[in-house]
Amino acid sequence: PMFFESMQRLAEAYPGIPIDTDVGARAFLPLIAAGRPVGSCILGFDRPRGFSPEERTVLTALAGLIAQALKRAQRYDSESALARGLQNALLPLRLPEVDGVDTLGRYLSGTQGMDVGGDWYDVIDTGGELALVIGDVQGHGVAAAATMGQLRSAVRAFALNNYDPQEVISGTNRLLIDLDPGQFASCCYVALDPVTGVARAVRAGHPQPVLRRPDGRTEVLELPGGIVLGIDEQASYPVTEMRLEPGAMLALFTDGLIERPGTDIDEGIERVRATIERIGAVPLAETADQVTGEARAATDRPDDIAL
């Protein structure tokens, strides 16, 4: 640290430097964190003044605190950028095009913390069926995004090898327990035959989906399900078979869309159902815009959202 009682003293120490000698004292404080410079702090005063030993000690200590805070902020920015890049790389760039079925996915990051969570969606063309997937890994940040990527890859591998829906979820559950004991995730997996409209659905601790029928009636599908993934390797996940008629629309979403302070999840799901019923049979993009409209407009979104 360097302390100059006046700009005249600074000019004497560094002759030839353009200096406004009409202003006061200056304190130049290097910001050092973990033995490396991360910046500098310059304190200016409007008049000449001396710096007592106590003041110099306090200002030097203050510079140390600023350096640590700046270092943490830089690390946070780096980790946040890494997590966002990881998640963007893992979410599908495009969804498969299959005759008779229109699909659309949306993702909104949270506005708190790392801004990146473990929500994901996927649509997988298995050759005979179309697998619709929505999932949510506990937590936020790089770890959640990394776990999400592993689970998404596992689900895709099981699906592309024509595993039954129950086997897909059971296998993913065992994988998560092996990968990270103590971590858990929810998931809903629907295997749809695009020709017959027959769908087989499995739910693991995930919010119930919403179905709009061709006549406009909209309902919450009360799918029996198992516990979240990552808790019990012997957990069972029942399969529900249903038929989606031409013109029907199925909405899968994560809890970030339906959670609000002071309300329970069932109220949130009912809110989504009512919104879908109200807007009627419009293009999927418009439906997604209206369903997520309130969340997109919110300045405080504690959780990320996948639809």
Model-identified regions with their sequence ranges:
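A short, aliphatic-rich beta-strand micro-motif
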Residues: G24-A33, T240
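… and, occasionally, acidic/histidine-rich disordered N-termini of signaling adaptors
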Residues: D77-A251, D289-Q290, D300-L307
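Regulatory sensory and allosteric helical modules in signal-transduction proteins
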Residues: P1-I19
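Allosteric cytosolic regulatory segments
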Residues: T60-A67
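C-terminal catalytic subdomain
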Residues: I169, R243-L252, L257-L307
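Short loop/turn motifs at secondary-structure junctions and domain boundaries
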Residues: I17-V23, G182
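Alpha-helical transmembrane segments within multi-pass membrane transporters and channels
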Residues: E55-V58
